[in-house]
C-alpha cells in the first residue's frame, strides 16, 4: 500500500517475544522482567494480523524478538506464514545461539533468510557485550545456515567505540573467506543504547572508507545498507546508519510488537494497539490502512525535545 508520502509499505517486522537468552549492553538490562503472558499476542492473533496485512499489500515478513527462537511456536508461525501466497519473503533476526539445532526445521517450515547478530569475533569481547560466553554456538549457527543454503546469511554487527570498533578489518576479512553479508550497524540511542550512545557511537563510514580495497556495489531497492565487496571475496560488506544518515524517504516497513501494537516508525513513541480489532477483520484492515497511509515521513531521534520511543529495543523488535 502507498502511504501519503508515496512510499510502498510492503514489509512487516513482527516481534514474537520480548525474551532473550543474552543481555547485550545496548539492548537488555541484566535484571529485567518480561511482559506477562496474558498481555502478549498469541500465535492465532499473529495470523489474524497477517491476513489483514497481506490484504493491504504486505508481502515481506521478518520475525524478531527479543530472541524469536525462544518462542516455542516459531516453526508453526513460519509454516502458517508460508501458506499465505501473497508473502514472498520470510526471514528472522536472531542471535544465532539456537540455530544449530533449529535451523533445519525452520527451513522446512518455510524460512527463507536469516540475519544473525554477532558484534565481535573474539570470545572475551562477546562475553563483555552479551554477558554470556556463547560465541561458539553463534559461529556454529552461521555455518549451519550456510550449509542449509539459507542465503544470503547476513551478520548484523553493532559497532561500539572502545569495545569492538577495532574489529572492522576482521569482519571485512571474514567476508573475503565466507559467503556472508556483513552489515555494520550504527549504535542507536534507544533504551540501554542511550546510556552508552555518546561515548560509544562510531563513524562507520569513515572507518570503512579508510580501506582502499572496497568496491561499491548496487544495493537492492529499499535496502537500508550501503554495500561493498572485496575483489575475489566470497561475501559482501555494508553499513547501516539510521541516525547519522537516515533513510526515511525509502522506508517500506512497519513493526508489530509482541504486545500487539503497531509502530509505524522504530524511533517514534507512536504506537497503535490493534488487539481491540482482532476479532473484526474488516475493521482491522481499515485500521491498518489508516496507520500505513499516515506513516510519518521521517524520524527526529537526533533532535532535542521530540517524542522518542520510551521502550527498550528488545520490547520493540527493532
From Swiss-Prot:
The keyword Lyase applies. The keyword 4Fe-4S applies. S-adenosyl-L-methionine binds at residues 26, 66, 117, 188. GTP binds at residues 13, 62, 93, 154, 253-255. Disulfide bonds: none annotated. Coiled coil: none annotated. Its cofactor is [4Fe-4S] cluster. It comes from the Bacteria. One of its GO terms (biological process) is Mo-molybdopterin cofactor biosynthetic process. Its EC number is 4.1.99.22. It is an enzyme of class 4 (lyase). One of its GO terms (molecular function) is cyclic pyranopterin monophosphate synthase activity. PROSITE patterns: MOAA_NIFB_PQQE, RADICAL_SAM. NCBIfam families: moaA, PRK00164.2-1. Monomer and homodimer. This is GTP 3',8-cyclase. It comes from Clostridium acetobutylicum (strain ATCC 824 / DSM 792 / JCM 1419 / IAM 19013 / LMG 5710 / NBRC 13948 / NRRL B-527 / VKM B-1787 / 2291 / W).
Amino acid at each position: 500500500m502507498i502511504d501519503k508520502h508515496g512510499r510502498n509499505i510492503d514489509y512487516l517486522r513482527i516481534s514474537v517475544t520480548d525474551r532473550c537468552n543474552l543481555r547485550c549492553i545496548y539492548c537488555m538490562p541484566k535484571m529485567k522482567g518480561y511482559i506477562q503472558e496474558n498481555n502478549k499476542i498469541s500465535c492465532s492473533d499473529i495470523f489474524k494480523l497477517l491476513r489483514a496485512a497481506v490484504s493491504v499489500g504486505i508481502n515481506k515478513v521478518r520475525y524478531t524478538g527479543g530472541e524469536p527462537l525462544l518462542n516455542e511456536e516459531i516453526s508453526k508461525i513460519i509454516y502458517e506464514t508460508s501458506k499465505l501466497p501473497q508473502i514472498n519473503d520470510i526471514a528472522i533476526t536472531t542471535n544465532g545461539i539456537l540455530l544449530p539445532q533449529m535451523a533445519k526445521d525452520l527451513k522446512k517450515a518455510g524460512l527463507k533468510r536469516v540475519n544473525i547478530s554477532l558484534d565481535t569475533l573474539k570470545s572475551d569481547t562477546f562475553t563483555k557485550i552479551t554477558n554470556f560466553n556463547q560465541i561458539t554456538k553463534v559461529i556454529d549457527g552461521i555455518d549451519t545456515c550456510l550449509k542449509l543454503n539459507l542465503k544470503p546469511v547476513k551478520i548484523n554487527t553493532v559497532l561500539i567505540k572502545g569495545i569492538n570498533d577495532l574489529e572492522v578489518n576482521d569482519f571485512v576479512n571474514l567476508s573475503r573467506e565466507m559467503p556472508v553479508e556483513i552489515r555494520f550497524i550504527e549504535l542507536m540511542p534507544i533504551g540501554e543504547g542511550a546510556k552508552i550512545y555518546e561515548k560509544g557511537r562510531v563513524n562507520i563510514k569513515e572507518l570503512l572508507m579508510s580501506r582502499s580495497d572496497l568496491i561499491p556495489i548496487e544495493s537492492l531497492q529499499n535496502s537500508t545498507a550501503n554495500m561493498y565487496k572485496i575483489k575475489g571475496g566470497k561475501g559482501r560488506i555494508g553499513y547501516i546508519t539510521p541516525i547519522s544518515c537516515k533513510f526515511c524517504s525509502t522506508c517500506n516497513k512497519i513493526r508489530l510488537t509482541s504486545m500487539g501494537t503497531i509502530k509505524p516508525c522504530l524511533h517514534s513513541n507512536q504506537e497503535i494497539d490493534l488487539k481491540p480489532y482482532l476479532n473484526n477483520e474488516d475493521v482491522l484492515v481499515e485500521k491498518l490502512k489508516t496507520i500505513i497511509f499516515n506513516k510519518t515521513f521521517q524520524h527526529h531521534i537526533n533532535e532535542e525535545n521530540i517524542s522518542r520511543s520510551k521502550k527498550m529495543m528488545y520490547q520493540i523488535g527493532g
